[in-house]
Amino acid sequence: MAQKKGGGSTRNGRDSESKRLGVKVFGGQAINAGGIIVRQRGTRVHAGDNVGVGKDHTLFALIDGHVQFAVKGPAKKQQVSVVPAA
Protein backbone atom coordinates (compact mmCIF):
# COMPACT_ATOMS: atom_id res chain seq x y z
CA MET A 1 0.00 0.00 0.00
CA ALA A 2 1.15 3.51 -0.76
CA GLN A 3 2.08 5.53 2.28
CA LYS A 4 1.23 8.87 0.62
CA LYS A 5 -1.59 10.01 -1.58
CA GLY A 6 -0.84 10.69 -5.24
CA GLY A 7 0.73 14.13 -5.70
CA GLY A 8 -1.23 15.14 -8.77
CA SER A 9 -0.07 17.84 -11.13
CA THR A 10 -0.78 21.55 -11.16
CA ARG A 11 -1.34 23.85 -14.10
CA ASN A 12 -0.02 26.86 -12.21
CA GLY A 13 3.41 27.59 -10.82
CA ARG A 14 5.24 29.47 -13.56
CA ASP A 15 5.64 33.11 -14.48
CA SER A 16 8.09 35.00 -16.66
CA GLU A 17 10.80 37.05 -15.01
CA SER A 18 10.21 40.82 -15.07
CA LYS A 19 12.29 42.67 -17.67
CA ARG A 20 12.96 45.84 -15.61
CA LEU A 21 11.88 48.18 -18.40
CA GLY A 22 11.22 51.90 -18.01
CA VAL A 23 12.91 55.24 -17.49
CA LYS A 24 16.19 54.89 -15.59
CA VAL A 25 17.25 58.57 -15.52
CA PHE A 26 14.58 61.27 -15.29
CA GLY A 27 14.45 64.82 -16.67
CA GLY A 28 16.95 67.22 -15.12
CA GLN A 29 19.19 64.49 -13.74
CA ALA A 30 22.88 64.27 -14.65
CA ILE A 31 24.12 61.41 -16.81
CA ASN A 32 27.49 60.21 -18.07
CA ALA A 33 28.21 59.17 -21.65
CA GLY A 34 27.05 55.59 -22.16
CA GLY A 35 24.54 55.76 -19.32
CA ILE A 36 21.14 54.16 -19.97
CA ILE A 37 18.22 56.61 -20.01
CA VAL A 38 15.28 54.36 -21.03
CA ARG A 39 14.87 50.60 -21.46
CA GLN A 40 11.87 49.88 -23.69
CA ARG A 41 10.21 47.53 -26.15
CA GLY A 42 9.80 49.44 -29.41
CA THR A 43 10.31 53.20 -29.57
CA ARG A 44 7.81 54.52 -27.04
CA VAL A 45 10.34 57.30 -26.41
CA HIS A 46 12.34 58.60 -29.38
CA ALA A 47 16.00 59.61 -29.38
CA GLY A 48 16.78 63.33 -29.58
CA ASP A 49 20.09 65.20 -29.54
CA ASN A 50 23.09 63.33 -28.10
CA VAL A 51 21.09 60.14 -27.52
CA GLY A 52 21.88 56.78 -29.11
CA VAL A 53 19.59 53.80 -29.75
CA GLY A 54 20.63 50.22 -28.97
CA LYS A 55 19.52 47.15 -30.90
CA ASP A 56 16.83 46.47 -28.27
CA HIS A 57 15.63 50.13 -28.52
CA THR A 58 17.43 51.12 -25.31
CA LEU A 59 18.20 54.86 -25.26
CA PHE A 60 21.61 55.90 -23.93
CA ALA A 61 23.61 59.12 -23.56
CA LEU A 62 26.34 59.89 -26.10
CA ILE A 63 27.82 62.74 -24.03
CA ASP A 64 27.99 63.82 -20.38
CA GLY A 65 25.17 66.20 -19.49
CA HIS A 66 21.60 66.48 -18.23
CA VAL A 67 18.56 64.55 -19.45
CA GLN A 68 15.72 66.54 -21.00
CA PHE A 69 12.33 65.10 -22.03
CA ALA A 70 10.05 66.85 -24.55
CA VAL A 71 6.88 66.17 -26.55
CA LYS A 72 7.44 66.84 -30.26
CA GLY A 73 5.42 67.15 -33.44
CA PRO A 74 1.73 66.83 -34.29
CA ALA A 75 1.75 63.16 -33.24
CA LYS A 76 2.93 64.28 -29.76
CA LYS A 77 5.82 61.80 -29.64
CA GLN A 78 7.91 61.77 -26.48
CA GLN A 79 11.57 62.53 -27.14
CA VAL A 80 14.60 62.53 -24.86
CA SER A 81 17.78 64.55 -25.37
CA VAL A 82 20.99 65.10 -23.43
CA VAL A 83 22.10 68.72 -23.06
CA PRO A 84 25.75 69.40 -22.17
CA ALA A 85 26.34 70.47 -18.58
CA ALA A 86 27.02 74.21 -18.42
Swiss-Prot record:
Belongs to the bacterial ribosomal protein bL27 family. This is Large ribosomal subunit protein bL27. Pfam families: Ribosomal_L27. The gene is rpmA. It comes from the Bacteria. It comes from Cupriavidus taiwanensis (strain DSM 17343 / BCRC 17206 / CCUG 44338 / CIP 107171 / LMG 19424 / R1). GO terms for molecular function: structural constituent of ribosome. Residues 1-10 have a biased composition (Gly residues). Keywords: Ribonucleoprotein, Ribosomal protein. The keyword Ribosomal protein applies. SUPFAM superfamilies: Ribosomal L27 protein-like. Residues 1-21 are annotated as: Disordered. HAMAP family: Ribosomal_bL27. One of its GO terms (cellular component) is cytosolic large ribosomal subunit. One of its GO terms (biological process) is translation.
